[in-house]
Amino acid sequence: MRDARVRDERVRRTELAGAVGDAQRLAADLDGAADRVALVRAAIADANARRDATLAAGASIAAIARHDRYLRRLRRELDAARGEALRAEAHHRDQLGAVDEARRRLTLARAEREVIERHFAAWRAERRKLAERRDD
């Protein structure tokens, strides 16, 4: 019985370690997605500044149209990057819930093992006392 409880606790500890590892990996993915959003926003700001400079310099309609197409493409990339960041955040939040659940299961397994150990310790002590009484 004790071996089963010890094995159960070991399995729960392994599950918790796996969940924590997944959460750390997803946190890194989330940071990467946030970095991509920041890079695209910086590119949009730079493109807007170049477009304004082009307009101030009196550029041709074709050059302005190229800048506008480039800005539209960057905005689509920003939308995609923001969507990716939101999905990564939701996935990370779900994984944190899985970590909490694994931690709860480990705590329960440890508590069950301790209850069993206390029960058998009390049972052994009672048997020892009973044997001592018989000897007297």
Residue spans for each PLM region:
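Charge-rich amphipathic alpha-helical interaction elements
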Residues: 1-136
